[in-house]
UniProtKB/Swiss-Prot annotation:
Protein species of origin: Burkholderia mallei (strain ATCC 23344)
PROSITE patterns from the UniProt entry: RIBOSOMAL_S9
Family membership noted in the UniProt record: Belongs to the universal ribosomal protein uS9 family.
GO cellular component: cytosolic small ribosomal subunit
Gene: rpsI
Keyword line: Ribonucleoprotein, Ribosomal protein
Descriptive protein name: Small ribosomal subunit protein uS9
Domain of life (superkingdom): Bacteria
GO annotation (BP), single: translation
UniProt xrefs under Gene3D superfamilies: 3.30.230.10
Pfam families: Ribosomal_S9
Record-level Gene Ontology MF annotations: RNA binding; structural constituent of ribosome
Length: 130
């Protein structure tokens, strides 16, 4: 806990989010912008709000987020992971519910590297019999 802020770091793909929460009225600010301005897709907004709605804290915390790296979906996932960790820092009794929903576990899937001699990570050149 930093002052009256609770902190959580979230990661997803190559995105990293630093999340600070404190008691408030439900404002979420991402990189200095309101969340609805920062994330253009409705699914991204839904992903970010999932841990708050699960724990019935959607209107009880003001959230400040610094997120960098990755794309929109990766950043939304990183913010969700960071909010989850910050909520656990605030109240450890929320951990079982968040864990059962799968929000505590860091999604370890990363982009597979491209291999030499292939078009992509696994896509080979088209094979011709003749």
């Amino acid at each position: 806990m930093i002052g009256n802020w609770n902190y959580g770091t979230g990661r997803r793909k190559s995105a990293v989010a630093r999340v600070f929460i404190k008691a408030g009225k439900g404002d979420i600010v991402v990189n200095g912008k309101p969340i609805s301005d920062y994330f253009s897709r409705e699914t991204s907004l839904m992903i970010v709000r999932q841990p708050l709605e699960l724990t019935n804290h959607a209107q009880t915390f003001d959230i400040k987020v610094n997120v960098s790296g990755g794309g929109e979906t990766g950043q939304a996932g990183a913010v969700r992971h960071g909010i989850t960790r910050a909520l656990i820092d605030y109240d450890a009794t929320l951990k079982p519910a968040l864990s059962n929903a799968g929000f505590v576990t860091r999604d370890a899937r990363e982009v597979e590297r491209k291999k030499v001699g292939l078009h992509k990570a696994r896509r080979a050149k088209q094979f011709s019999k003749r």
